Amino acid sequence: AVLTPEIDSITWKQPDELNLFVHTHDASNSTRYYRWEYEETWEYNSWFEATLDFKDGQIVSRPPEEQVFTCWRSDSSELINLGNTSALTQDVISYQPLTTITQASSFERNKLSVRYSILVKQLGLTKEAYNFWNILKKNTELTGTLFDPQPSRMPSNIKCTTDPGRESIGFISVGKITQQRIFIRHSAVPSWPLLDESQTCSKVTMNSIDAPAYLQNDPFYSPV
């Protein structure tokens, strides 16, 4: 098993987009090969605060436990993120890219609207396990253009015990996972743009007398 060193820090830079990085080192120079995964969780608010609800044909107050103004959402890494220091004198990883939060969509911009968190998991690999993940990355992520590498044969340390001639694909490795979490509040990135009303759901204004009849025909409350 590979003993994975602790993560030194997770940092970020924000010229326009927000780029996140991981930093680590092994003072014994024995790890050398690394893989990272991450889980994102962010808090955001709905544009309108719904203090009322429509139940059984009546408009009623929404109790605190049913508030829908504060929301949370999570996402996880999908791409294979690898690093190695085999060509370096010291086993030090600095500014290894993790992910980038862009301003291109409301989904991305919402991540930093209130508070954002990222949990980074780090795993030390053997050279053989690193080669497996590196080939898998090339075969699955770096394809589709004339200049991409050709798919390679996958290494494997799995064998079929009932049929030794049958090829098996996969790689088993054992190691310790180290992890670290950071939080970023919107106040730390004050220039980050927030959504405006034109990018949210439209508002319908009416008097309280007409509201029950309108909601009675709304597909959200009265699905067909």
Model-identified regions with their sequence ranges:
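A sequence/structural signal for flexible, mid-protein segments enriched
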Residues: 1-224
